[in-house]
Amino acid sequence: MPSSSDTALGGGGGLSWAEKKLEERRKRRRFLSPQQPPLLLPLLQPQLLQPPPPPPPLLFLAAPGTAAAAAAAAAASSSCFSPGPPLEVKRLARGKRRAGGRQKRRRGPRAGQEAEKRRVFSLPQPQQDGGGGASSGGGVTPLVEYEDVSSQSEQGLLLGGASAATAATAAGGTGGSGGSPASSSGTQRRGEGSERRPRRDRRSSSGRSKERHREHRRRDGQRGGSEASKSRSRHSHSGEERAEVAKSGSSSSSGGRRKSASATSSSSSSRKDRDSKAHRSRTKSSKEPPSAYKEPPKAYREDKTEPKAYRRRRSLSPLGGRDDSPVSHRASQSLRSRKSPSPAGGGSSPYSRRLPRSPSPYSRRRSPSYSRHSSYERGGDVSPSPYSSSSWRRSRSPYSPVLRRSGKSRSRSPYSSRHSRSRSRHRLSRSRSRHSSISPSTLTLKSSLAAELNKNKKARAAEAARAAEAAKAAEATKAAEAAAKAAKASNTSTPTKGNTETSASASQTNHVKDVKKIKIEHAPSPSSGGTLKNDKAKTKPPLQVTKVENNLIVDKATKKAVIVGKESKSAATKEESVSLKEKTKPLTPSIGAKEKEQHVALVTSTLPPLPLPPMLPEDKEADSLRGNISVKAVKKEVEKKLRCLLADLPLPPELPGGDDLSKSPEEKKTATQLHSKRRPKICGPRYGETKEKDIDWGKRCVDKFDIIGIIGEGTYGQVYKARDKDTGEMVALKKVRLDNEKEGFPITAIREIKILRQLTHQSIINMKEIVTDKEDALDFKKDKGAFYLVFEYMDHDLMGLLESGLVHFNENHIKSFMRQLMEGLDYCHKKNFLHRDIKCSNILLNNRGQIKLADFGLARLYSSEESRPYTNKVITLWYRPPELLLGEERYTPAIDVWSCGCILGELFTKKPIFQANQELAQLELISRICGSPCPAVWPDVIKLPYFNTMKPKKQYRRKLREEFVFIPAAALDLFDYMLALDPSKRCTAEQALQCEFLRDVEPSKMPPPDLPLWQDCHELWSKKRRRQKQMGMTDDVSTIKAPRKDLSLGLDDSRTNTPQGVLPSSQLKSQGSSNVAPVKTGPGQHLNHSELAILLNLLQSKTSVNMADFVQVLNIKVNSETQQQLNKINLPAGILATGEKQTDPSTPQQESSKPLGGIQPSSQTIQPKVETDAAQAAVQSAFAVLLTQLIKAQQSKQKDVLLEERENGSGHEASLQLRPPPEPSTPVSGQDDLIQHQDMRILELTPEPDRPRILPPDQRPPEPPEPPPVTEEDLDYRTENQHVPTTSSSLTDPHAGVKAALLQLLAQHQPQDDPKREGGIDYQAGDTYVSTSDYKDNFGSSSFSSAPYVSNDGLGSSSAPPLERRSFIGNSDIQSLDNYSTASSHSGGPPQPSAFSESFPSSVAGYGDIYLNAGPMLFSGDKDHRFEYSHGPIAVLANSSDPSTGPESTHPLPAKMHNYNYGGNLQENPSGPSLMHGQTWTSPAQGPGYSQGYRGHISTSTGRGRGRGLPY
């Protein structure tokens, strides 16, 4: 190689070189003129498609890589411009000396450029760089690049590819498969040179290039068959090509350049020839690892100077802008090829410029991959042609992302650099696999596309050569620095290589790199030939990978010593040799590797004649080792490793200098991974913002809190009152369950957390932190736990206080509350958040009178510019503004103001001002007070979607001031302003604060109201309390209601607390029994109520009732689980009120347990109930279970058992037993007595329950404004029920008989409790109910908002408890229930009772149904619970009821199913319409719910009683 380089530099064609250089210079000048662009355009265009040429810094990076290259570039520029010819002559002499045959071959392809290419491919490949520099020195550098790019890329694509292949073959014969890439790059350079030279020179050079291509082919064949050469070319593209690029790179690149020069001279014919020959040479060169590949290690080091050449080329070439990247890539490649073949040539040889032009498949690939793969270069790891890109990268710039880039771009498109940059990216991956996969795609490219691509690549190579030469001329050191920087900034394929070479800072290195580049370019040039392309592609990926590694090494070396080109070369060579050994010979494309490859090529005799450019001994060793490695094995290994390496290469952005590049791709990968791992640390501080996380894991678990009790239920979990163990501070824990979340974490919770963290205001609830129920975050992987949002604790909420009746708010209190509320809301709105769920239960109040807005689960960021619609299904119905009811989806903060206006009215009236259960009814209520929405008062209302479909029944005028005349004038003004129909006319929160009513209010100076310090009044508590009151205040209604709630709440609420639940269970039992009896007759309904009261009284009368005993007494069939539960449950004596005749007076336990539950507000058993609340809760759940089972058993056996039981007391017991299975939740000890007494009481108590059933208006739940008829029905219903129960009891159904027996038993017990019962049945029942309601309140209040009261909640807002909801929220619900379930029972009035009778006939079981249904009714949303408890029993009841009930039962049951017992009865009954509602509302599963629905009606009345609107 050195001899050849010497020959190329000094001798061998000195004249031809000088002439060629002069011609090339002339041509360059021509091309500098607009003429060159046209040539470049076709060539550059495909390259243009590819990523833009590496930026000048990349070029500089490449340039610094090779001081020699820079020197060569300078020499080239100087020689090209003036001293170029002498340098060329020297190079020619050297090239001739180095490889006479190789140089001749190269000369053959080139006239003048070929001489340079000879230099380049012979040792002068560096010389070629120098030669390129010379040519560029001629002043033609940019022009030559463009010209060469155009003519060479065309010719090079044709000839260049052919000549590259030939040169590779010639060089390959001489220097091994590396020759082909070298020759192809050489052809490009030759083409460039030929363009620079007279066309005759080009022609001669094309002829030479053809000859060289032929020689390379011969040598390829000599090397060992096309496949061996192919594999070699692939491997040598990566490894051997580097060595051979050094070897054949010198000869092949010089020869290739000659070829391309000659090809350039005859641009069209030469191009065709080149394409054909390029395909051949590519095939051969791909077979033989291109010398460029072998040489790339050295060339890379030298390439460090190349970037300068690149710069020069870019600056020199007017078209450089377009092709700069390809040219620079090619130039760097060609420079490398040149450098490797003739280090002496340094940048003087026109080849260096021509190299970019040179059509060598490698250079082309490179140039395409350079330009194309500029993105690839960025990726640095993804060079499509691992051969050129990786090896180029590695050897090229230690800095260097640029190296990667160049390698990528080069190796990327073996077919064509310009095909498409998108392709180049695809080829990035391809190039790695290209060696293996190029053939199919390459075949296509081998066609005209391949030729064009090769041309483009040549043009790029020419531009790259020009830029490299210019960069070399500029400064080797600057180029090295720039290359390092550029490499760091982005791994540009060519520039990166150039950077590496520049850091090598050896002109020889640059030449070697140029030679390598040329060879590689030849190999990649798609026009070389399908096989060549495939082989080269295959070879290139490993080459690129190796080069990338080498470049990384070189980058390291460059960083360490940009000036020390040898060190970088050696480092690159070492790593390359290692990588080549590991991966394949081609894989080691470091600068030293290139030289070594050249040397190895000599050793391997791939390119024996080509003198190797001066190489480091290490490089030589690496080359020899690489050469020793089998080409095929190397190819495979290189391909595999190249891909991995390319993938492993760190991205240029990650590499600040060349450190990462200097590192092996794997090292870079590791570093990248480390960075990614560090990112969590970066995020960690962000999480640190969420103090919760730092506190959470391990430090802040929910175990750090003592949970005191449940205070509410939210949309995604319960809310607990808790005490911080560390600080003793009271907090509210909002549980966020993850179990049922499909998305992992509830969006409402995420939204609430996100928003609350942005809101800091004294009137907005403060979220302190977030804790979990796991000690370790890893536990969440095993078991989805729960998160707890920790809030400051607020003692009350507005709804609980208003519902409690314990507090009276005066005007000043209301002013203070509204002032604080509007301040918080104004803050939210100024922060652009809509709360969208303002209601009394979300307004929290502490004992200091401070108001805080809570529950931001529905809140969202508001943007007036946002076009996306919002959902209008927000805000609880009672507080929903008319625009949302009419379908507005682009609402404003005015929606929250309306809600606050509703609250203002509620503070004065103590009840919700608009209580409807449906949107249409809600709009009707609003219209009655605020006037009907119409364009006159609300111009935009006509634009709303539902304006025409939701019109009120008639037009109302605004009566707000008349209706609320009792409100103070200032408050009324604000009230009127806040409830303006037109949201645009509605006041804003800020305006509200400026109104007369709130202007001068200072809440901090105002005394707080006299709040109940002993009781926290929350919504849940209020609901429970309401239920209890309902149970106590309205025996029948509350009894029915309570049982229903108990059913739904019983099991659930039993946990909450409520002896009521237990009593309701017995009540439910009684109801179930009475229902069983009346299933046949309408009166059964009332009996059900009576029986409920009787059962409650019985239970109360008994000191203690063991549920298991009760079940046994009743002969209720219970499963083992239920039996166990029942064994655990003892009915408190308090629940029974007194130990009367109940056979199981084991109440001491129950009583004691009762005190635990003491929440029942019933007069008689309040304390015991309070004590036994917990017990009652358990009892309630047990009762619910028992009732369900009893109902089932009753339904199945009701007929026969009832008939027989009527005849026999045992029969009654049996019937009761049958019934009790539905009543599993009614634990009554002494059931036999109870049954008897119940039967007795059913008769006796029926009137008594009727009395309590009739409630004073105060006790009655307020009528929902919309469904007053329902209210009437409720009242009528109660009366009817009272009477009807008697009728029912009197009616003799098998169930009726059983019920009668039970009622009698109850009555017997009750007579003892009669005093109690009047006050006690009502209240004991009430207590039972209270406990039930209390239970419900506890459970229901929490679930009330949900659907604890199925019928209530289902109908009305689920926010209020059934009664409260009915009255407060649930009036609408009540209405719904009334309209639906109760409506069916009520609407008929007495006929409804018959309907109920029918429904209860189904309902005697239906009564149990009522229980069960009550559960479902209570949980309209929890139909499952209802069915769990009552569904089966209902079915049983329905079945038994049908036969026993007779036609009525049969009709309801058959018509509706037992589930439809109530509904079926209703249908039959006059309450058909309401029944229809009930049926429709309840749905089949809720049909029995209609029995419950019946209760639901009762609960409706209770709801009203519960409602704040009525005297409560």
Curated annotation (Swiss-Prot):
The modification Phosphoserine is found at residues 315, 317, 325, 340, 342, 358, 360, 383, 395, 397, 400, 437, 439, 525, 1048. Residues 49-58, 1254-1270 have a biased composition (Pro residues). Residues 160-171, 246-269, 383-401, 462-489 have a biased composition (Low complexity). ATP binds at I711, G712, E713, G714, T715, Y716, G717, Q718, V719, K734. Residues 189-198, 295-309, 511-522, 566-585, 660-670, 1043-1055, 1201-1210 have a biased composition (Basic and acidic residues). It is found in: Nucleus speckle. Cyclin-dependent kinase which displays CTD kinase activity and is required for RNA splicing. Has CTD kinase activity by hyperphosphorylating the C-terminal heptapeptide repeat domain (CTD) of the largest RNA polymerase II subunit RPB1, thereby acting as a key regulator of transcription elongation. Required for RNA splicing, probably by phosphorylating SRSF1/SF2. Required during hematopoiesis. This is Cyclin-dependent kinase 13. It comes from Homo sapiens.
